[in-house]
Amino acid sequence: MKTPGVLLLILGLLASSSFAIIRIPLRKFTSIRRTMTEVGGSVEDLILKGPITKYSMQSSPKTTEPVSELLKNYLDAQYYGDIGIGTPPQCFTVVFDTGSSNLWVPSIHCKILDIACWVHHKYNSDKSSTYVKNGTSFDIHYGSGSLSGYLSQDTVSVPCKSDQSKARGIKVEKQIFGEATKQPGIVFVAAKFDGILGMGYPHISVNNVLPVFDNLMQQKLVDKNIFSFYLNRDPEGQPGGELMLGGTDSKYYHGELSYLNVTRKAYWQVHMDQLEVGNELTLCKGGCEAIVDTGTSLLVGPVEEVKELQKAIGAVPLIQGEYMIPCEKVSSLPTVYLKLGGKNYELHPDKYILKVSQGGKTICLSGFMGMDIPPPSGPLWILGDVFIGSYYTVFDRDNNRVGFANAVVL
C-alpha cells in the first residue's frame, strides 16, 4: 500500500507533466495610420493604388479559390508581443494576426534601400545553431509593391525568453518562416512591430507553409488546441493585454463563453445575423459573413453600409479614411448591436469611439471603417480590436469555433 506521501508525490508528478497555459504579454502601440498622421504623412496614395492585400491573390493547390485579405488592416494594428527565432533566440516583436497564416520577420540580408529593415530587428541565420536552409522565394503583394524574401527553417520560442524571465514558454521546432529582404514603400517604416505571426488556417498560408500554431499542435505542445486574447482597451493601460496559448483565463471575463462555429476554415470566419445602430439602422440584413481579426484595431464592413453607419452616428470624414465625431457628443451616441448566434453583443459609444491625440489636442474618431472585399472571399465584415477589446475571444481549433464572453475592465 502506497503511503500518503508517495501518493502526493505521484499526483505532483502527474500534474507537472501536463502543459500549463503559455502566456504572452501584449503591448499596445500607436498604429501606423496614427503615426503617419501625427507627422503629416499620408497613406492615401497607398490605399488608392489598387487591391491592397495582406497576401497575394494566389490559390492553394487544394482549392481553386483565391484567398485575400487587406493590408489596410496593418495600418491600424495596435497590439504586439515578443517571440524568438533561432538558438539562442533572436527576439522580435510581432503582431499575432488571426487574419493571416504566415510568420515573417526582416532578414539581415535585406536590400540596402529597404529603409523599414534599418529600423527593425533582423534575423541572422549565422547566429543560430538550429537554422536549416530552405531558400524558396516568397512574395506577398501589396498595393504599393511587394514584400519579398525567402523561406528558412528554425526554432520559434514563444515568448522570446532571452531576458531569462521566469514565464513559461515553448519551443516550436522546425518552423518554416519568411525572411523578408524587401518591404514595400514607407508603410512598414512607421510600424512599431518587426513582423507578423499569422494565426489563421493553413488554407490561406502563402507557399502552403504550415502555420506556427498548426506546427505547435502537431508537436503536441499544449493540452488544448485553443488560444485566446484579452485586449486592454485603456489607452494608458499596460500591459496592453495577453495572448494565451492552450487555454483560457476566467479572470479576464465574466459570464459564460458563447461559441460560434467557423463557417469557412481560412480566416476565423463566422456568420453574423445582423448589425443594428440603436433603433435607427439595420445593416447586414438577412445575415452576412464576418472574420474575427486581431490584426486590425477597427470594425470594418462594406463601404456603402459603413457610410450609412457613420451617418447614423453623426461621424464626418476627416483624413486618410478616418471619421471624426465631436467628443462632447460621444455620450449621446447610440449603442451598436452585433447579433451573432442569436445573441446581441453590445458596443457602447465609449467602446467604438477612439480618443487619440492629434496636433496636441484630443480628438474622437469612429472605430468603424468601410472596405470592400471582393468575392469569392468577400463580402466580409471584420471584427477587429474594437470588438475583441469588449469581448474576451477564444479561438478553438479542436472544435473549429470562436467563443466570446464579456471582457473585464482591469
From Swiss-Prot:
Main enzyme class: hydrolase
Chief subcellular location: other
S-S bonds: 91-160, 110-117, 284-288, 327-364
An annotated Gene Ontology molecular function: aspartic-type peptidase activity
Catalyzed reactions per annotation: Specificity similar to, but narrower than, that of pepsin A. Does not cleave the 4-Gln-|-His-5 bond in B chain of insulin
Positions of the Peptidase A1 domain: 79-405
Keyword Endoplasmic reticulum recorded: no
Sites carrying sugar chains: 134, 261
Enzyme Commission numbers on file: 3.4.23.5
InterPro entries: Aspartic_peptidase_A1, Aspartic_peptidase_AS, Aspartic_peptidase_N, Cathepsin_D, PEPTIDASE_A1, Peptidase_aspartic_dom_sf
Subcellular location: Lysosome; Melanosome; Secreted, Extracellular space
PROSITE patterns membership: ASP_PROTEASE, PEPTIDASE_A1
Protein name, per record: Cathepsin D
Organism: Mus musculus
